[in-house]
Curated annotation (Swiss-Prot):
NCBIfam families from the UniProt entry: orni_carb_tr (TIGR00658), PRK01713.1 (NF002470)
One GO molecular-function entry: ornithine carbamoyltransferase activity
Gene3D superfamilies associated with the record: Aspartate/ornithine carbamoyltransferase
One GO term (biological process): citrulline biosynthetic process
Subcellular location(s) per record: Cytoplasm
Pfam families found in the cross-reference section: OTCace (PF00185), OTCace_N (PF02729)
Organism encoding this protein: Neisseria meningitidis serogroup C / serotype 2a (strain ATCC 700532 / DSM 15464 / FAM18)
Family the entry assigns: Belongs to the aspartate/ornithine carbamoyltransferase superfamily. OTCase family.
Any one annotated GO CC term: cytoplasm
Protein function: Reversibly catalyzes the transfer of the carbamoyl group from carbamoyl phosphate (CP) to the N(epsilon) atom of ornithine (ORN) to produce L-citrulline.
The protein's name: Ornithine carbamoyltransferase
């Protein structure tokens, strides 16, 4: 499978076989790192990390993955980057493309990362946009593969909550591309766009995936192997939307009762993080004082239970991001 010099922007750009090749490479690289026998395949390479949105996991994953493989990284933080402010995306791409072997972008519009690819002349990796989160999808798929005990095309998962943005969009496409049984449980007003749903159905025709969108959370999770969720209010949204979102999504909160509704005693909980699962953050305490909720999209009981595999999932961000870079740039 030749993934050399490929951009990594969204899963819709890849065949099921190519996505599986990334997962296989990630598993191989993970095993090599754990065994202390990792071979550096990116010596002398340099990666630019453009962050218009802050991040813990994505930044750390790219930096550790690159350094493990012998590559250098430059982190361009939100306050330091001139992209789109004093310098156009087109010009930024052409400058960085002369200095770096690859560029990671984490920001807002998908159009921005797509434009970078047109002018950079080097592989561009999408660390997150409003529309898609493809590196997270590889981590999620690898984590499900590790914990499922069966092939992904025999695995079922549900995403419950606000499904309009990058996680809902991307998980729907992931399941469709890999022939999985994928369900979205959300109010219809918070479903992915018609275009995303149509793309998922088109992919499912090729792979045999089963796609379900429902407003009934219990129906969504019935007989699944994994239950995913994400925060109910996204980065940059005003505090005023919290009450509206809580009213809309209270029935989609991942509680022990919702986990039990799967009917699967081995069901696992997944979350891309950060999660509002208790009062131990400033935002979590504010939510508790304002709305009386100790934990929002997931309860502390579920988050800290043996069913929670969120930290395996977080670790796999690094191994899968490493696979993307090695596939594109490795010797």
């Amino acid at each position: 499978m030749n993934l050399k010099n490929r951009h990594f922007l969204k899963l819709l750009d890849f065949t099921p076989e190519e996505i599986t090749a990334y997962l296989d490479l990630a598993a191989e690289l993970k095993a090599a790192k754990k065994a202390g026998r990792e071979i550096q395949r990116m010596k002398g390479k340099n990666i630019a990390l453009i962050f218009e949105k802050t991040s813990t996991r994505t930044r750390c994953a790219f930096e550790v993955a690159a350094r493990d493989q012998g590559a250098g990284v430059t982190y361009l933080e939100p306050s330091a980057s001139q992209i789109g402010h004093k310098e156009s995306i087109k010009d930024t791409a052409r400058v960085l493309g002369r200095m770096y072997d690859g560029i990671e972008y984490r920001g807002f519009a998908q159009e921005t990362v797509e434009e970078l690819t047109k002018y950079a002349g080097v592989p561009v990796f999408n660390g997150l946009t409003n529309e898609f989160h493809p590196t997270q999808m590889l981590a999620d798929a690898l984590t499900m593969r590790e914990h499922s005990g069966k092939p992904l095309n025999q695995t079922a998962f549900a995403y419950v909550g606000d499904a309009r943005y990058n996680m809902g969009n991307s998980l729907l496409i992931l399941g469709a591309k890999l022939g999985m049984d994928v369900r979205i449980g959300a109010p219809q007003s918070l479903w992915p766009s018609e275009g995303i749903i149509a793309a998922a159905h088109a992919a499912a025709k090729e792979t045999g995936a089963k796609i379900t969108l429902t407003e009934n959370a219990h129906e969504a999770v019935k007989n699944v192997d994994f239950i995913h969720t994400d925060v109910w209010v996204s980065m940059g949204e005003p505090k005023e939307v919290w009450q509206e979102r809580i009213d809309l999504l209270k029935d989609y909160r991942v509680t022990p009762e919702l986990m039990a509704a799967s009917g699967n005693p081995q069901v696992k909980f997944m979350h891309c993080l950060p999660a509002f699962h208790n009062r131990e953050t400033k935002v979590g305490e504010w939510i508790y004082e304002t709305f009386g909720l100790n934990g929002v999209e997931v309860t502390e009981e579920v988050f800290e239970s043996p069913a929670s595999i969120v930290f395996d999932q977080a670790e796999n961000r690094m191994h899968t991001i490493k696979a993307v870079m090695v596939a594109a740039l490795g010797d």
